[in-house]
Amino acid sequence: DDWMAWQMPTTANPWIDAEEVDKAGESLPSIAFRQEYLAEFVDAAGARIKREWLRYGDCPEGLPTYIGVDLAISTKSEADYTGVAVVSRGDDGTIYVRDINRTRSDFAAVLRFIEMMAEKWKPSMIGIEQVQYQAAVVQELLRRTKLPIRGIRPDRDKVTRFAPLEARYEQSQVMHCQGLPAYFEDELLSFPVGRHDDVVDALAYAWQVCGSKRSWGAV
């Protein structure tokens, strides 16, 4: 049978509310918006975080802190790191990346590492990846501490998990505070094809617990 194909943007559909499209443009990374709403064929290579999107500045005083943890239990030199990211969210929605740290340690040392970061930052919530053996870390911290722990079960791939933050980087809504380690930007600017992405994953988990308050609504 003969067939024909059309390539048309969502904006050409009279049944789609223009306001809905505008909101999607604000909440999605540009590559996703161009693919899904503008019907463009976009090459995803190198389309994640761009250096020109990075902003630097100080975090306002008095904002609550949130910690995200991407777990890896190993001391082997080739193993992944346990990554920790500390963020705050300003009244205007700006995300402040306040601290980044990582360790390559065994179970007991990882527990101490998380406790140390919590003691330093006094977080309102700690989001910890909770899958398979990593669930034991969450259970042990809940048993032996009074820390505000929330186990997070990854239900999406890492690029999709990071997409809300990617959109905010592109819209100049993420601020890097002073003193962050150089490896953080190395990971960020090579994500998702770099050798390591542990602290980027931790940042995505920090965003999940920071951005989950219903009072903030959808962003």
Region locations from a protein language model:
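Charged alpha-helix within mobile-element recombinases
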Residues: E187-C210
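ATPase catalytic-site recognition across NTP-hydrolyzing enzymes
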Residues: N13-L71
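Mg2+-dependent endonuclease catalytic cores in nucleic-acid-processing enzymes, primarily RNase H-like
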Residues: G83-G194
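Hydrophobic residues at beta-strand termini and immediately following loops
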Residues: W6-M8, Y37, I100, I152
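An active-site-proximal beta-strand-loop segment
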Residues: V69-T82
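Acidic two-metal-ion nuclease catalytic site recognized across multiple nuclease folds
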Residues: G46, A206-V219
